[in-house]
Amino acid sequence: MILKSKDLLGLKDLTAEEIQYILNTAKTMKVILLSKNKKAPHLQGKSIITLFYENSTRTRLSFELASKYLSANAANISVAASSVAKGETLIDTGKTIDMMGADVIVIRHSMSGAPHLLARNVKASVINAGDGMNEHPTQALLDMFTIIEKKGSLKGLKVAIIGDIYHSRVARSNIWGMTKLGAEVSVAGPSTLMPPELDKTGVKVFTTVQEALIDADVVMGLRIQKERQKSGLFPSLREYSRFFGLDEKRLKLAKEDALILHPGPVNRGVELPSSVIDSERSFINEQVTNGVAVRMALLYLLTRRDSGESVN
């Protein structure tokens, strides 16, 4: 099997089979990641460029490490120190990178649709590392990988996503991906942070966290994205935590073996208290490790589309 597109722009347009193929490949990549040498020659001679217009620690670093673990040449463009600061357009920047022989461009941008625009104008494969409030497909893939690793499958699982759904590209990608793999997804958060289009996605929408948590197999907290919000969407972080914080008492409504996830960075004491973050039910650190494996898989699959090679 090969991925149909040269790019990974979102999970909305992927089939369930393609998603599962990526996740299966990530299993093999995790073996490499956990090996003593953490090195494989699969991407030798390939060049991976990270182009981030927004701040990032986990996503950018994991892509860079994923590239190096597979023996690719990896380079990061600091937007503030590049010609972008002089007014260069995204398309011109992309074409410049393209002409230097890049095989993959990993882009994060504040504008929804920026990766799609770039992909239409370059020969290199483009991976969406987060575009505005639209999608964050690699985060959702690593979330699903983590769940399947612990639960065996997503089919039939109840997944509760709690928090700022409106501004969350992570929530959107997870909704697309998890529902395609058979999960029952519920969301909860302040009514001011609920997007109107949720009715079309087949998820259950609640305005109280308690309803969403009942018998949940997986609970995912989302970061309050203050940088994307206008004032007045909720009174204060303290009030948010009071009504939607995932403390031990509320989490008792979920199943006893429910997984606790968060895409990070976590606002400790707001979305989750430290006692939950650092508990045995929390798999937040495992998500970080799995993120490298998933991104290794994507880099491999996108750069080997025309070769017919298999990693297995």
From Swiss-Prot:
Catalytic activity: carbamoyl phosphate + L-aspartate = N-carbamoyl-L-aspartate + phosphate + H(+)
GO BP field: 'de novo' pyrimidine nucleobase biosynthetic process; 'de novo' UMP biosynthetic process; amino acid metabolic process
Enzyme nomenclature, EC number: 2.1.3.2
Binding site for carbamoyl phosphate: 58-59, 108, 136, 139, 264-265
Residues engaged in binding L-aspartate: 86, 169, 223
Keyword match Transferase: yes
Pfam families, per database record: OTCace, OTCace_N
Annotated GO MF terms: amino acid binding; aspartate carbamoyltransferase activity
Pathways per UniProt: Pyrimidine metabolism; UMP biosynthesis via de novo pathway; (S)-dihydroorotate from bicarbonate: step 2/3
NCBIfam families found in the cross-reference section: asp_carb_tr (TIGR00670), PRK00856.1 (NF002032)
Subunit-level organization: Heterododecamer (2C3:3R2) of six catalytic PyrB chains organized as two trimers (C3), and six regulatory PyrI chains organized as three dimers (R2).
Function: Catalyzes the condensation of carbamoyl phosphate and aspartate to form carbamoyl aspartate and inorganic phosphate, the committed step in the de novo pyrimidine nucleotide biosynthesis pathway.
The protein, known as: Aspartate carbamoyltransferase catalytic subunit
Gene: pyrB
